[in-house]
């Protein structure tokens, strides 16, 4: 076993700058040439090791040998972009006005489909925030023509068609309109199967692609949506093998790869830009495309400033000295900026990245590095919420505690600007519950105890950290959340409980083998097998995946139900955070090992602009 030397943090973090400050105050360093994009190679090993934190009093510890930070601070600080120039913003503003006019120029034969296509295009291109009124007007118009058989292409259509109906079902449902999936029954044949030909024409394939996308926003007990997903999935898998490589084949592959719950809006925008000219041949797609590229690159310039701020925070806080923890702050920022591109929401993006990084640091301390005595002291210190509580902590914990304390308080200050009241008590309660759940897991590891599935699952909803990653970031948004509404979003509300449960289950299916190798035996898989003697790992995974599928439908309902009084934007941000976590777990544990998918996401959505 290897000996690993760990340099402790200073007793107090070196935070000389505001942790959440206006990005306009950040002064990025400049280079005349954009540096070649690169990352450090990562060949992670997850082995049991010994380490010493004190040269006099050696302590045996478990560590995971996570690979180091892939994105050097010097490299981050050297990034530069020309897209801060006012001329780009001025051109974008002119195009916004021209695109608004496009919402009005539609004929009676296909005006319903054209309106839906316009809404879908501006959303998929990531420019919908400029057209809120136009989108609402377009969808109100479509909904006024909706009936029990769906809709046709235009207001004068006498027959409903599957393509328009499926697109409308999905789009209207995502915007909170009360539409029933029963309309899909009208597109089945006499044998109860969705009617289609054996030829697989382009029009039919597009209809089935929209049917597939609609099926992903299913609510509980919608049998027709389950049937639609099964049928369209089979159909599209066969179709994509037969048709030539084209914009249509790429859209099929993208949608089947990412679906809805793992799709990231900025990633989709980057992907869709290459195909949308072919997707909207009957509209002036060039204007939409130019606007989308300008907006992408203008936001790219803001991303660089925010990323430099975050990298300085990480460096100045002393995290680089903690060699036993994962350093994923750049990846977390990337995920945040893939779901929120509003320039006013810097505090949300930076706050999410910082909260997630703190969660990761504490996860590595509680699960592997810290001793039981140290963890008890740290848990008590969090509950005291006072810098003097660090007196009895080991040196490396003092620095971590102070970064947590100062970051949470700084974010509470940002939240006060939006909410008009002090919200620190919400945050403290969330952190206390979170740290208690970690302590319970540490006790299971120390004692070798394996809890029941239910006990592990309920505690795991809290220890996953979803509440921490959501609460303070959404409080910084420009949407007031009074106490009674906030209670419907935060744990243990139905909405938050479903999200936390889904992520705990999904995370365990990706992490349980590596966790077990580190001596962390408890997981949803092992607890299920222990509760059900004779059950195999495959049985446990099948059971958990079935649970996730059903919980996702319930979560869809909690998110999209029309009669909810919680602001849609707040629920949407909370939902989008589940999407970024899902995305990281799509192929494997992308948070312990920054795989190629995550690296490419950083490059294509943050570091590289799109060619104009």
Swiss-Prot record:
Its EC number is 4.2.3.108. Keywords: Chloroplast, Lyase, Magnesium, Metal-binding, Plastid, Transit peptide. Its main location: plastid. Mg(2+) 3 binds at residue 515. Mg(2+) 1 binds at residues 363, 367. GO terms for molecular function: 1,8-cineole synthase activity; lyase activity; magnesium ion binding; terpene synthase activity. This is 1,8-cineole synthase, chloroplastic. The lineage of its organism: Eukaryota, Viridiplantae, Streptophyta, Embryophyta, Tracheophyta.
